[in-house]
Amino acid sequence: MPEKSPAAVMIANRKLEVQEFPVPDIGSDDGLLRMECVGVCGSDWSFYLGDGERIGARFPFILGHENIGIIDKIGRDASRRWKVSEGDRVAIEEPIPCGRCRYCLGGRYLRCDENRRYGSHIQTTVPPFLWGGCSRYMYLHPNALVYKVPDGVSAAAASLYLPIANGIRWVQQIAGASSGDTVVIQGPGQQGLGCVIAAKEAGVSRIIVSGLQRDAMRLETARALGATHTVCVDEEDLIARVAEITDGQMADLVIDVSHGATQPVVMALKLVKKCGGKIILAGAKHKPVPEFPTDEILYREITIIGVRGHDFRSIEPSLQIIASGKYPIHLLGTHSFGLERTEEAILTVGGQGAPNAVHVTVLPWS
């Protein structure tokens, strides 16, 4: 066991450096994770730009909240509680719930009042320091949310657990999509593709995914995962295309997972059916939506729901879907980078690095 662990630390906006931290001793109630694979998503891009401060991120912090690793050390009480042993591959949710506030007690721990999260919300000045997955080791707090990865599932495959879990929660558990429905997914990134899988699992009849010309490969992947239609909005009128596909009835559910762009929010009002249509807003914009026609919501009786993340009710099904081998999820894993190249991984997710990225990972031991 090394005495120190290198880790990728955000020290300021657009400033990242690799630092070393002591590997902590473990008691009866906590554990130590030997990191294998860290998924990088749009939230990491926001943290890199400094936009995470509005939701509680504080510099300096170790990046990495989509974490897969091997239990290296674990206390007796922690092993009993999490039902895992040394050598087990596990997935970790990013929240560290307090377990006492009304949100935790109600099962809504993503909204925990203490707002502690791996990979963003705990500074490196807080012992035992290793609070993010972009490190060779990560500390497992007694309140960490730990899930055993099914046997036979690789670290690379398991790293897709959060995008798929997000899709399950948004499409199935919140929106209630089911057989016979038409679902439009705006944005074919990893979150949108997770929604495709969730919609397919729910038995949705028509799954329509929209994107730009630069998303051609992602749209192909959407088809491979189960989308019935894909639309390049640079070449086709999305509203007209959805009207054609649905015989003018439009979509039962529209999910906007696009990051930064506000136009899809306004367009969603025209894509969704009247009287009972639902819109899920899952893509952060970090700015107001101009000319948002609120009267459309009233007159057409549309429901709009904001969503963020996943929970235990969607994590377990996500891991089981991955283990089933039903979907070619390997198509999502497009780029991997070593720890020293964490910044390049983030830039790739933000569209300023390697091209044609879908799901990007950091491999801390590479």
Model-identified regions with their sequence ranges:
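C-terminal hydrophobic helical "lid"/dimerization subdomain
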Residues: 1-7, 221, 236-237, 244, ...
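Glycine-rich cofactor phosphate-binding loops and adjacent beta1-alpha1 units
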Residues: 174-179, 208, 217-220, 224-302, ...
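Cytochrome P450 core scaffold surrounding the K-helix E-X-X-R motif
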Residues: 43-49
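Glycine-rich beta-strand-centered segment in the early N-terminal region that forms part
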Residues: 24-38, 52-105, 144, 150-152
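Short Gly/Pro-enriched turn/cap motifs at secondary-structure boundaries
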Residues: 11, 22-23, 58-64, 126-131, ...
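Mid-domain Rossmann-like dinucleotide-binding core that forms the NAD(H)/NADP(H) cofactor-binding site
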Residues: 136, 150-236, 240
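Rossmann-fold dehydrogenase core element
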Residues: 278-280, 292-331
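NAD(P)H dinucleotide-binding glycine-rich loop of Rossmann-like/cofactor-binding domains
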Residues: 98-186
